[in-house]
Regions:
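Acidic, glycine/proline-rich intrinsically disordered low-complexity segments
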Residues: 1, 22-29, 78-79, 177-181, ...
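A short helix->loop->beta-strand "cap" motif at the edges of active sites that frequently abuts
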Residues: 114-119
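Anion (oxyanion) recognition and catalysis
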Residues: 50, 113, 147
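Conserved SGNH/GDSL esterase-like catalytic core that processes O-acyl groups on lipids
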Residues: 26-33, 37-107, 127-137, 170
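Catalytic His-Asp segment of secreted/periplasmic serine-dependent ester chemistry enzymes
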Residues: 37, 75, 127-189
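Single-pass alpha-helical membrane anchors
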Residues: 1-21
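Hydrophobic positions in alpha-helices of CheY-like receiver
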Residues: 108-112
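Short strand-turn motif at the edge of the Rossmann-like AdoMet-binding core
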Residues: 123-125
Length: 189
């Protein structure tokens, strides 16, 4: 065998190991720590649970801030394989200092990892594509800071149809599917 063969075989093995792996279907225990953006019955979390057969504990609540989410998640004694964290909208729209939000997200990540979970932070959509409000711009600024959080951070979904986000914040089924596909391709494959 020649050297080129071994190089090609090695590259193929590396490709297979890192790019063809997929989260195994089955009864993985998954937690979602979020707000109203993670509560839709046709939401990204249920789309992914359907694809992978997960059992989900959803700690999301309408109007929930990162501080409230941290307290709710901290009160749980359950352990999870994966914890999805999708927070920040209510902090931003409520005028909470972004440094506090980032600190709360770090605490949620640390708590999840202490319980043995993989963490996946979801910044969500590019809000300035669907709203020109000052809060939308501040929310995008917060999302840009999330990339420095420990663990996996999904990229911001930038291809959003304004018609599917009528209030500039909450999105419909098409955007939930886009977000589920982005999360799937970025963090689960």
């Amino acid at each position: 065998m020649n050297k080129a063969y071994y190089i090609a075989a090695g590259l193929a093995a590396i490709y297979a190991a890192f790019y063809l792996r997929k989260a195994k279907a089955g009864k993985k225990r998954v937690a979602v720590v979020g707000d109203s953006l993670s509560l839709s019955s046709a939401g990204w979390q249920n789309i992914l649970a359907g694809r992978y057969g997960w059992d989900i504990d959803n700690f999301s609540k309408i109007g929930q801030t990162s501080g409230q989410a941290l307290a709710r998640f901290m009160a749980s004694s359950n352990t999870y394989d994966t914890v999805f964290i999708f927070l920040g909208a209510n902090d931003t729209y409520g005028g909470i200092n972004p440094a506090f939000t980032i600190d709360n997200l770090k605490k949620i990540i640390e708590l999840a990892k202490d319980k043995g979970a993989k963490t996946i932070v979801i910044p969500g959509i590019l809000s300035s594509k669907v709203s020109s409000s000052p809060e939308a711009l501040k929310y995008d600024d917060l999302k840009s800071k999330m990339i420095y959080l420990p663990g996996m951070v999904v990229p911001i979904l930038r291809t959003v149809d304004r018609k599917d986000v009528p209030d500039g914040l909450h999105f419909g089924a098409a955007t939930h599917k886009q977000l589920a596909d982005l999360i799937d391709s970025w963090s689960l494959r």
